[in-house]
Amino acid sequence: MKTVHSASYEILRRHGLTTVFGNPGSNELPFLKDFPEDFRYILGLHEGAVVGMADGFALASGCPAFVNLHAAAGTGNGMGALTNAWYSHSPLVITAGQQVRSMIGVEAMLANVDAGQLPKPLVKWSHEPACAQDVPRALSQAIQTASLPPRAPVYLSIPYDDWAQPAPAGVEHLAARQV
């Protein structure tokens, strides 16, 4: 059975987002598990540098860039560079790891208390899927939203236990969407 993890990587692959810019922490490890051989990971030592590299990559290539940040702390660290990306109209698809679903709302260590609000107003769209099965659709929507005029960064908070969950039936059409 296809997992949220494998379905999400297929969506990224089909949209050409095979370069991942990041500075991972524990919340991002399930996403990075079984990292595809046809993807490359650009490691930055600080989230500001990571977002800055992705911003430059998107501007130089004319294509969206994919960023994976560490929870709320990493998102906060990347906000200065996110400001530049916002004003440059860079199509960044930014994901951040979130605490496991059962810990959201109890202010556990590494939980982003109000994930959808944290990066605003520096993103065009910010979202945390309501359930694991909604992650592939939300990722597809993030890519589409970042890519459509006016291009701009988007943000998606993903609880780290979502990656191992079964993907919903019929997610294949999400990878085939074109802007």
Per-range role (PLM):
Residues 1-179:
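N-terminal alpha/beta PP-like core and its mobile active-site loop of ThDP/TPP-dependent enzymes
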